[in-house]
């Protein structure tokens, strides 16, 4: 048979495309193999279709040749052409049934899907060899076969018989070269079976005559159809499963969307939390700033308190000065009045010119006195403004005073009632209209002119002892009585000496109304003097009266100099020999009643002595005790007084003369600290560290004031009752403090002993200036404000800080090992910094991370600076755990058992957060430097002390024969007398960091 040209061209085109498809199958696996098989099957369909059409058009049928089948797994399923059956029959007969049996075995393998590729390829190679092709070609060309072949559906032609199809050759070659060793998948097999069932349906003659295996093939096809149906069912089931999986995927996508929404909301919550944390940190920083401001306000309050005390002292001194001025003015007026009387009552012709001269001189003096009074009023108004300003400042301080003032109020109430200065102020404030009515005098320091303008100038000094004025104006004195003893005379300084060159601004009267009243009273005295000068007097009682008056008005020449001109000097010189008239009784009685009424209403008997002492304080005199006592004794012997007055004077002098050496500005004792009045000292008026020479002579009242001044007013009664003097106090022991003075607190006993020892040894250290207010602020700086109450109760100051022991710390409830170490290292830092209050830094450098290591800077950090550093290294969420923890820079530098692990435990970092702990350790080691870290590591390796932890406890080892309890794991045993900061630092503390050079180089 001959193929048509169109079919041949299509065949050639398809043959040329086969190698390309095979190459693709080599690269892409089963997918490309499926495409290859599909294209091969289509080519075979075209060949068969074209062959059938050609066989119908031709009339001659050559010998049938083999039709190539391109799939190895279905080659044996196709029956050979009729032309080849006769060729195979002799071979089959020669080999018996071996070939058929073998073929049957292969078919069974195909049915079961177990055919081996290599066995199939060997079978193909064994059956379809080139010799068989040649033999079949020869048989077909001879045409001498006597057996007639049945008609075949396959195309037969000379070209196809002599040359097998190229597709077949390439496919066989691929199988021989084992390039298609993979088994075809199920889909490929189904396609092959469909092609076999659809394209190889034999004719009836072929099924009955030429193909005895046709029933078996039909069974196989039926089984394959059933397998196809089952596979389709499986595919449908799988598609349903895929649909279910898709629904599950959709559900999962919905869940994922919900999770994403939850994650978004969680992130928003976290952002809000971070914002809240930032706000909390800001509030914490503001809180720390407020605490610092409160501490500064407390310090300012303490400063204002001291200033208030000083202002009160100045105010009292001013009141005393004014009172002394009034007394001096009163004495001068009395002397002037007596001079008027003597001038007016003198007899003889020579007294008339003297009286006229005296009258003219009095007019001049009164004009000058008025001028001085005007200046005094102006100065007094200025002084009143200053006093009002001071009082307003005191009122403001009193309104802002805290509860401490209430605590000391009871100690001051009973003393204020007996304060002479307070009584004077009350009199001046309650009765301003007549507050100066008792003194119709002018200040001692008033200027006057000399006689005829030629006399020398002299100065009248204020008296340091005013007993003479007291006797002169005492209500018990009688001008007409005759005194025993020799009358004393006035001591003139010289002839023509006058009072001169004195300013009136040295002393001021209590209030402007009183100063204005002074001029009116002077005018009244002048009128009384002029009226008295016109009366006639008898000369019988003149020597006696004048003698008594002179004896009562005479002041010591060392203290007061009085001169009234030439006439006064002549009068003083001839007082004992010249007979002088005596004033009338009505004038004497009138003057005496006026003076007695004023003094009875305004003054006490012992007041002048007190005023004298206050005046000595104001002038700052350093009086000699022996000299003052001798002067007073001499003065007392020359005077004649009544017995009652002598008793009062002895009482007042006995209490004041013993302490005359201490009555000066800045001394520990005050003039009003007498046995009669009790302790009238306010807090701040007694020095905490007086000189030893003064302290040994202190009495019980002064020592009681001192014990209150150092902060223990609860022991005032015991001290005033049992301690006789300062020397006795210095010689007392600790047991006497507890048994006699009832000081049960051991910290109080230690502080009293420390202060007494420093007074005795005159120890001057930088710690002396460190008070309890600075200690309380220092506790805020180191992060331990919870101990402020107990430190304030024990009045812990600088000297006591240096002397605190482990037993004292336990007594003050400091039992946490971490807090104990914080106090110890902070005290060590204060000692190195010479107790400079501003040595610690509350703020850190913003570029601190770039300046690692810097131990000299870290040692000055406060607790708040450490928190700021933690925020700087991104650990802000843990800083709130440092509240009341106490982690200053001194603890990190000086404490060898404080490591990064200790800080992590204080920050409460979870142990499983190793990255955070490693981050903290890295920054901690870089901050302190390798040397300090190496010292800490070596110290802990020795095993003498455990690493600090927030759960550690301090235990004081008690010496005795009792059974010792086993030490717990977190306990640190210390000796009772071990100092928190020893005098000499031993190997327990690292060296080389935070020395004094670092403080000198700092700007604090």
From Swiss-Prot:
It comes from the Eukaryota. Residues 50-122, 135-161, 341-366, 432-497, 528-550, 648-686 are annotated as: Disordered. Keywords: Coiled coil, Repeat. Disruption phenotype: Defective locomotion, reduced pumping rate and reduced brood size. Defects in presynaptic and postsynaptic structures and functions in muscle cells. Resistant to the acetylcholinesterase inhibitor aldicarb and to levamisole, an agonist for postsynaptic acetylcholine receptors in muscles. Double knockout with the syd-2 mutant ju37 increases resistance to aldicarb and levamisole. InterPro entries: Liprin, Liprin-beta_SAM_rpt_1, Liprin-beta_SAM_rpt_2, Liprin-beta_SAM_rpt_3, SAM, SAM/pointed_sf. Expressed in pharyngeal muscle, particularly posterior bulb, adjacent to the dorsal and ventral cord (but not in ventral cord neurons), and in body wall muscles. GO terms for cellular component: presynaptic active zone. GO terms for biological process: neuromuscular junction development; positive regulation of locomotion; regulation of nematode pharyngeal pumping; reproductive process. CDD domains: SAM_liprin-beta1_2_repeat1, SAM_liprin-beta1_2_repeat2, SAM_liprin-beta1_2_repeat3. Residues 280-328, 364-396 form a coiled coil. Residues 434-453, 531-541, 648-684 have a biased composition (Polar residues). Residues 50-63, 149-161, 458-474 have a biased composition (Low complexity). PROSITE patterns: SAM_DOMAIN. Residues 698-762, 770-833, 858-930 form the SAM domain. Belongs to the liprin family. Liprin-beta subfamily. Involved in the regulation of synaptic function at neuromuscular junctions. Together with the liprin-alpha protein syd-2, may play a role in regulating the structure of the neuronal region, called the active zone, from which synaptic vesicles send neurotransmitter signals across the synapse. Does not seem to be required for neuronal development. May regulate the disassembly of focal adhesions. Does not bind receptor-like tyrosine phosphatases type 2A. This is Liprin-beta homolog. It comes from Caenorhabditis elegans. The lineage of its organism: Eukaryota, Metazoa, Ecdysozoa, Nematoda, Chromadorea.
